[in-house]
Amino acid sequence: MCCGPLGFCGPCSPCGGPCGPCGPCGPCGSCCSPCGSCCAPCGPCGPCGPCCGGCGPCGPCGPCCGPCRPYCGC
């Protein structure tokens, strides 16, 4: 579990960068804070930005989730 971009914890998606694979990286504001988007609870959405936090599990996507659409099928 990692800290997501909106300050809640959820399943982490693989990504590069400072968090490595975004494994168990502790509380919000620690390892995962620079990793933000990759730790959003959207599964394998890739780097879709903080708005991805509103996608849930790649489910219904509002306008804010536009960057997730290629990954979430929205």
UniProtKB/Swiss-Prot annotation:
GO BP annotations, alphabetical order: sperm axoneme assembly; spermatogenesis
Entry annotated with the keyword Repeat: yes
Superkingdom of origin organism: Eukaryota
Signal sequence range: none
Reported tissue expression: Testis.
Alphabetically ordered keywords of this record: Developmental protein, Differentiation, Repeat, Spermatogenesis
Entry keyword Repeat: yes
Swiss-Prot/TrEMBL domain comment: This protein is mostly composed of repetitive C-G-P motifs.
UniProt record similarity statement: Belongs to the MST(3)CGP family.
Protein name: Male-specific sperm protein Mst84Db
Gene that encodes the chain: Mst84Db
